[in-house]
């Protein structure tokens, strides 16, 4: 058994192993292999500021584990163990990757390791830690339970994440008209304008960088990176899926939500052109929507901007979908968690992220 660096000669084998973990599963769907390919070929915007070292463990000429080790210039204290996949539990194989991550940290002057963070929180954070028998939703992680054991048994600190769900069929009005009128006196919510898509991404990036500057694992984004993130997703989205809340005509917050496209992606399919076509023809088959990301600039927090976004979103989804599912929230983020508890029905899937301080 040995650790092998990924080169142009074996890159296809790396990608094939990654995709196999999703395409052969009844519960999982492949939505990230396209981005991973751009990363491995050096074509992603992130490659301009991120060191990547894809590695794989080979045993008897068979790949058994893969990862991309990452060092981001804007988060230099970490070496990230990204895009981690393992076809079966093998601690010896994991320790080969872990040892290389520690060595990479020494080389790059980093002093921490992360597990489950994929380059940046916008691309994924957290291994699944519950509901392993449930289907994966679009944009969320799904993995065997033993993934967590690799990190928990090797001295990593666990960071708990939680998502929420809500019954949209039997749900009462989110707020009454009196509150809605008061919100409308201060805030207005608008759809994004796809005719000026690049400019809308400028607004999105600006709010992100203000809203999440103190968030765990967040580092400043560049507009070009967010544009790359959205340019393919845009073909599945409608303008109403990216909302902005404004005060006196100035954007102060946003909400990204979209249908759970995994409900129309079949087993063995990769998210792509076929998904776009199926979404145009059969979007009514999707019964769940996801609130993926929300952000409000610090000066407008706890003043109603988030509530205005929720109200706008729920009015447009109430009779279209049966269920709402949120993205993950840090379990220690009491304000976000309490908001989820108040406006959702119950907790949904749990996830875990990992950090290890190197001495």
List each model region and its residues.
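Short beta-strand-to-coil "C-cap" segments at the C-terminal boundary of structured domains/repeats
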Residues: 166-169, 355-359
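Long, K/E/R/D-enriched contiguous segments that form extended
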Residues: 198-202, 224-231, 285, 332
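Conserved donor-binding loop and adjoining core beta-sheet/short helix segment
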Residues: 25-136, 236, 246-264, 268, ...
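Acyl-donor binding region in acyl/amide transferases
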Residues: 76-154, 272-342
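Active/binding-pocket-proximal capping segment
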Residues: 222-226, 248, 256-275, 312-316, ...
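Acyltransferase donor/substrate-recognition loop-hinge adjacent to the catalytic core
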Residues: 141-215
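Short amphipathic alpha-helix that is part of the acyltransferase structural core
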Residues: 1-43, 50, 56, 182-222, ...
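Beta-propeller domains
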Residues: 208-216, 228-244, 255
